[in-house]
Amino acid sequence: MNLNSIPAFDDNYIWVLNDEAGRCLIVDPGDAEPVLNAIAANNWQPEAIFLTHHHHDHVGGVKELVEKFPQIVVYGPQETQDKGTTQVVKDGETAFVLGHEFSVIATPGHTLGHICYFSKPYLFCGDTLFSGGCGRLFEGTASQMYQSLKKLSALPDDTLVCCAHEYTLSNMKFALSILPHDLSINDYYRKVKELRAKNQITLPVILKNERQINVFLRTEDIDLINVINEETLLQQPEERFAWLRSKKDRF
């Protein structure tokens, strides 16, 4: 299968998987126009849409796409039922698309009903995990998001993390503010800075590398614990995650 990214709005990515026959899966189409343009340019035949959560920048293009291609099956969590979803899926279930089985993973935090889709090596994680960061807590709690990220971090090393936004540079600036001497973070920041200077995408990322540079996945890392302990003593990784998320909200 081929993985494609379609830019939308200011910083969204709509992901598309297509097979050799031209059948395709569309993930979080917040805007129909760039997707329709890509479909026409590549002669794709849309079979399915995956929705991760109910926010408009992830679901806004569904209606128009389904009107154009009524055969499309729209998978999504319960919270997207009024956004065009025709097949509600929940944690532990699977969606069989393009001859591949995608596992549904509940990842509450950004929204209460947020889900991700995984079929090795592809992880479509919406607004749960970003490169160098994680989603804001609009509906869920820090504890929920921490547990959600633990689930995703436990996936295979070679997982391709397909995030829904180009937030990597700002996330790495935050990471440097927390761990300014970390070699992995510094190296990745330089790489991302060069890519963004050329207006190039920083995604997808390999999960093994992401665990090294994403402070939100390093809440049990001794270097991070020492930094946090300089300000406040927090015993549990969930508490350290909440501390980081609060810092990032104000960054």
Curated annotation (Swiss-Prot):
It catalyses: an S-(2-hydroxyacyl)glutathione + H2O = a 2-hydroxy carboxylate + glutathione + H(+); (R)-S-lactoylglutathione + H2O = (R)-lactate + glutathione + H(+). Keywords: Detoxification, Hydrolase, Metal-binding, Zinc. Pfam families: HAGH_C, Lactamase_B. SMART domains: Lactamase_B (SM00849). Zn(2+) 2 binds at D57, H58, D127, H165. Disruption phenotype: Cells lacking this gene show decreased methylglyoxal tolerance. A double deletion mutant lacking both gloB and gloC exhibits almost no resistance to exogenously supplied methylglyoxal, and is unable to grow at MG concentrations as low as 0.1 mM. The keyword Hydrolase applies. GO terms for molecular function: hydroxyacylglutathione hydrolase activity; zinc ion binding. It comes from the Bacteria. Is inhibited by Cu(2+). Its cofactor is Zn(2+). Binds 2 Zn(2+) ions per subunit. Mn(2+) and Co(2+) can substitute for zinc in reconstitution experiments. Zn(2+) 1 binds at H53, H55, H110, D127. GO terms for biological process: methylglyoxal catabolic process to D-lactate via S-lactoyl-glutathione; response to heat; response to toxic substance. Substrate binds at R136, L137, F138, H165, E166, Y167, R245, S246, K247, K248. InterPro entries: Clx_II_MBL, Glyoxalase_II_hydrolase, HAGH_C, Hydroxyacylglutathione_Hdrlase, Metallo-B-lactamas, RibonucZ/Hydroxyglut_hydro. Pathway: Secondary metabolite metabolism; methylglyoxal degradation; (R)-lactate from methylglyoxal: step 2/2. Belongs to the metallo-beta-lactamase superfamily. Glyoxalase II family. Monomer. Type II glyoxalase that catalyzes the hydrolysis of (R)-S-lactoylglutathione to (R)-lactate and glutathione. Is more efficient than the isozyme GloC, and plays a major contribution to methylglyoxal (MG) detoxification in E.coli. The two isoenzymes have additive effects and ensure maximal MG degradation. NCBIfam families: GSH_gloB, PRK10241.1. This is Hydroxyacylglutathione hydrolase GloB.
